[in-house]
């Protein structure tokens, strides 16, 4: 708007001189007031601290961008406050821009720092809020970063042909190396001015040295001039490999033997996966623990079981042995020696009485039970009968899992007692009270064993009943545990039945002397279609009932002992399971009373053995096998 004349009005009329003077005075007053106001504003701005204004704005930002706590003020209030503070700060900056340029520069730096902090707070707040609101599945995964161009992976030479396998022949080595060289023809080479990376620091590992040494010797023996190393390898690594291979060629024959052992181990590992076996004629078999299953069976396990139960000999090539053998071990040599001398104790007529242990006849090294399959070992009293000898599975069997300590073999550690084979019924429950040792339950029908609950404690046989004869034995004689291992029984009237092996073929005089005991014996006829083996030994069980006076020292009960005097521990154990029973009555007197069996005249009690406990006749009312079995079951119910 242009400057207006003081002598005229807005419409252009001429003013009175008095009005003109008053108008000019008012104009000057307004101008002075404006100047005054500007000075007051400048003074107020100079009184304010710009740094304090920055701090106030930072507090507002922290209040606004706090992801944990909601701001105390409203968003609109925060925005208005920040706007006013920002305008004030701008006026101060303009004021100092005109009056003091240095202060102006400092204020601009403060403003930049504030803006940086505000941006960081805003980013942090947004990231936290987004993380709270977004789902994990919606977050896009980052792409795989590309390899930096400074690393030239293409220029690194790939290794040459792999060393040939130790299972391949020398004729295949040349073919494999030529094929690998042809396959590596497309590998890019290094540029002209570049050197490939050298070998790692330090000497090569011993496996690499042995590998190159074996390759060098194999090539030299085969006369092949095939080049094993690719041209792209470093010359330094070549020279090192050559030096180490030369040092390997100068090594002694012991190193070659160790290399052969390692090759054998690798070959065995490969055989485990591929199922093929490569064996060199000059290589000895490695001394390592192997699990071998020999299956050359021409008859079924059921037929073998029936042959064993009937007393017939099962051919050795028809057995199925699963044993853990140690090649080149002394135990196997001792067992082989003992197996060649096994038939001699079978025909020995001078056997001890049933109560005499065979500790004097057996060296202590043979007391430990070797791992056998099939029935339980012969050292302890036999396990519960009526157990079909199925195919072996698992570790060598021992006594039942819950058997007391006196039922365990003397030399068998507890670690070897594994679970029984899968086809066998479970043994007696663990923790049963120590009672009489297991024996055959008389009166069971012939044929396969019933599939009922397993018998808790098999009853002892009545006097004079011989179990089936064992198959021919091969191996050292088996030792029964001494009498001191068995605790006193709970019932003084239980019969003890230690079996002993007596030859079946005797002289007429001996047979006439023992006519009375054998007349009341329960003997096992051979199965139909077979003939009895005249040389097969017969196992007799002799019943002894101890008097209360002789057993009072051991707890007031009769001592029960069942000692199987069986020779061979290597083959399967004789099962005291009768297939057929025939009761022979006395021809002279038909009273039906069973006479007490006594040892034959040719069996003498050894001097180191205590005299046997006095015999007592059996109760006269137990006449048949069913009555004997019922009485025994009642007795066992009272015990258990």
UniProtKB/Swiss-Prot annotation:
Residues 28-37 have a biased composition (Basic residues). Residues 241-251, 315-338 have a biased composition (Acidic residues). It is found in: Cytoplasm; Nucleus. Keywords: Coiled coil, Cytoplasm, mRNA processing, mRNA splicing, Nucleus, Phosphoprotein, rRNA processing. A motif (PGR) lies at residues 421-432. Transmembrane segments: none annotated. GO terms for biological process: mRNA processing; RNA splicing; rRNA processing. The modification Phosphoserine is found at residue 285. Residues 356-371, 603-616 have a biased composition (Low complexity). InterPro entries: WW_dom-bd_prot_11. The keyword Signal does not apply. Its main location: cytoplasm. Residues 194-207, 372-412, 422-491 have a biased composition (Pro residues). Residues 1-11 have a biased composition (Polar residues). It comes from the Eukaryota. Residues 1-37, 155-174, 187-563, 582-625 are annotated as: Disordered. It holds the Pfam family Wbp11. One of its GO terms (cellular component) is cytoplasm. This is WW domain-binding protein 11. It comes from Danio rerio (Zebrafish).
